[in-house]
């Protein structure tokens, strides 16, 4: 019997997209080429709040990516409590990304350059491992 290995989708954090605007991020380019990069609505919103010439083009490109649904607020709040995400010095959008990765049936990994978010993603077993 032959097993089929399906590469996991990856939920990409805002800081990775911002860095990609300034200098190409190879891993992100590869994930996009493999159709594995997912865009979260809150990340797209954060990118929209940015400025610069590249912002409009990036927002247009992000709209072309496969999306991921935002879990209900009550589920996010429950996971924040259950997994002790509070007091870890991550922001709310970061906590939402972590919870989304844990709830979504595809179990996407989280790709970030943010140290605190990465630490929590590793702790919760949802960090992108390359």
Specify the residue positions occupied by each region the protein language model found:
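Ligand-binding grooves and catalytic loops that recognize ribose/phosphate and carbohydrate rings
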Residues: 54-66, 73-76
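Conserved short-loop catalytic and cofactor-binding motifs
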Residues: 15, 46, 64, 85, ...
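Short, well-structured N-terminal submotif of metal-dependent ribonuclease cores
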Residues: 1-42, 48-60, 123-127
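Charged/polar, solvent-exposed surface patches and flexible loops
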Residues: 30, 49, 60-64, 78, ...
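Active-site neighborhoods of divalent-metal-dependent phosphate/nucleic-acid chemistry enzymes
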Residues: 2-5, 67-130
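Residue-level signal for well-ordered alpha-helical scaffold segments within enzymatic catalytic domains
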Residues: 19, 46, 50, 78, ...
């Amino acid at each position: 019997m032959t097993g089929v290995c399906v590469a996991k989708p990856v939920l990409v954090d805002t800081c990775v997209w911002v860095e990609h605007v300034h200098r190409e991020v190879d891993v992100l380019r590869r994930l996009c080429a493999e159709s594995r990069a997912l865009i979260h609505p809150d990340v797209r919103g954060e990118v929209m709040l940015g400025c610069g010439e590249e912002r409009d083009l990036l927002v247009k490109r992000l709209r072309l990516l496969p999306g991921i649904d935002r879990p209900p607020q009550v589920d996010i709040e429950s996971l924040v409590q259950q997994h002790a995400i509070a007091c870890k010095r991550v922001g709310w959008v970061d906590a939402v990304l972590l919870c989304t990765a844990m709830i979504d049936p595809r179990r996407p990994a989280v790709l970030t350059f943010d140290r605190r978010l990465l630490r929590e993603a590793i702790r919760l077993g949802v960090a992108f491992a390359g």
